[in-house]
Amino acid sequence: MSSAMNWILSLGLFFLLKEQCYCIFAPNSTFLENLLNKYKDTTPHSRTRRAILRTDKEEIIQLHNKLRGQVHPSASNMEYMTWDDELEKSAEAWAEECIWEHGPTALLMSIGQNLAVHWGRYRQPAYHVQSWYDEVKDYTYPYPHECNPYCPERCSGPMCTHYTQIVWATTTKVGCAVNVCKRMNVWGDIWENAVYLVCNYSPKGNWIGEAPYKNGRPCSECPPSYGGNCQNNLCYKGDKHYGREGIVTNEVETPRFPEETPVWDHKKSNKPKAVPKTTQTSTENLMTQAIKCATKMRDSCKGSTCNRYKCPPGCINSKAKVFGTLFYDSMSSICRAAIHYGVIDNSGGLVDITRKGRLQFFVKSTRNSVESISKFKPANSFMVSKVSAQTIDCYTTVAEICQFVKPATHCPRFNCPAHCKNEPSYWAPVIGTNIYADSSSICKTAVHAGVIKDGEGGYVDVMPVEKKKHYFGSNKNGIQSDSIQNHKEGQAFRIFAVKQ
């Protein structure tokens, strides 16, 4: 491998996830100098430029459309993508912040977003676009007969949502920006002169339970507005690449944990000093979403961490609507539905959500001072349930309490004791990284994942998931987890910090 090999990392909406190795290389000073010169203004002492070069814009658009037109299985409704100036501006604003996470929060309600960062040798933005698309190798397309009513999420790698956002059929606009960050914290390491790429998309994709596109003969199901025009397997209106059109609403996944990337073992040279890897509590790796009284199920459901919410007090007096009884329409307020069902009272609290598929109608009733509304129209539904808390010891496993059962399983919020780190592995094993075998010790796993401190213990949230064939060990926070190949027993889980 070349000694100029660079670090490449990509981040895709939990925010998850679903993921923490680094690619080490010896940077070439000439490459780095050229890169910095390319993205800086020529005036003395000017700020780093975030606008992207027109040649890069054209390459990004051409590559997106090329990749969208060659999906397999073929897409019957894949639309042509154009550049959007407003999305570019929003990407510039976020790239300027030099924060390695999705944002800003207010904007994520209306756009999709892919992120990438590298350090060292120059890479064109299209290089990262291709790397996002390359997640296709881990993605299995859900055919219509598998969607009953929700399509299964089948990603055998650490992340597939960058790929699905790129090939989301109804996403028709993209705008990107590049910024050279003087100092950027990337998962605990401080990178100097980090090259940060932000691409914003609209309408956003990655709706939970939906396929990214319809399978069929190319252009056979294009929207009527395209007038039957087709170009390179894409629904096509004209040859205009750039536009100043408004942002349209849709949904994107926020990963909640970093990706597992291959380790390229090269000689170190001029690498920025890394922040010491000490035991620390992650403030970003959260499963519970804090929401408002008016937040609807459909508006809030982002990524796989879409089942636990924290409601504020005072929602009885809110005017947000609730449709149904027991089974609630996805356009209902989550918190008021929870009060209606009796899961929480007007003081707020935690609510677990279970999606229940499409129902033909919803029946009104008045319960706990909340009046729900009837709706005689088919829609997706959900149920609410109470979140309990359970104190456990260092040896308790997910398999003992809440092993994954399709379609979904909820676990209590667990309270871990301190000092589980040094418990022997034959009593308190930890198997895997980011996604763990459910025979692992919950509390020792929490220390390994960095969601609690060993000397303090504390609360953690757990999400049971389907088992993985392979689990890869790692040494994190003073704990060496185990690797297992061709694992056939049990299921798996993910673990999250709790923000008190």
Swiss-Prot record:
CDD domains in UniProt: CAP_CRISPLD2 (cd18816)
The protein's role, per its UniProt record: Promotes matrix assembly.
A Pfam family recorded for this sequence: LCCL
Residue ranges of every copy of the LCCL domain listed in the record: 287-382, 388-491
Organism placement in taxonomy: Eukaryota, Metazoa, Chordata, Craniata, Vertebrata
Residue span of region Disordered: 260-281
Signal peptide extent: 1-23
Disulfide topology: 293-311, 315-335, 394-416, 420-443
Places the protein is found: Secreted
Protein name: Cysteine-rich secretory protein LCCL domain-containing 2
InterPro entries: Allrgn_V5/Tpx1_CS, CAP_dom, CAP_sf, CRISP-LCCL_domain, CRISP-related, LCCL, LCCL_sf
Domain SCP: 62-201
Homology family: Belongs to the CRISP family.
Keywords annotated in UniProt: Disulfide bond, Repeat, Secreted, Signal
Gene Ontology, cellular component aspect: extracellular region
PROSITE patterns reported for this sequence: CRISP_2 (PS01010), LCCL (PS50820)
UniProt source species: Xenopus tropicalis (Western clawed frog)
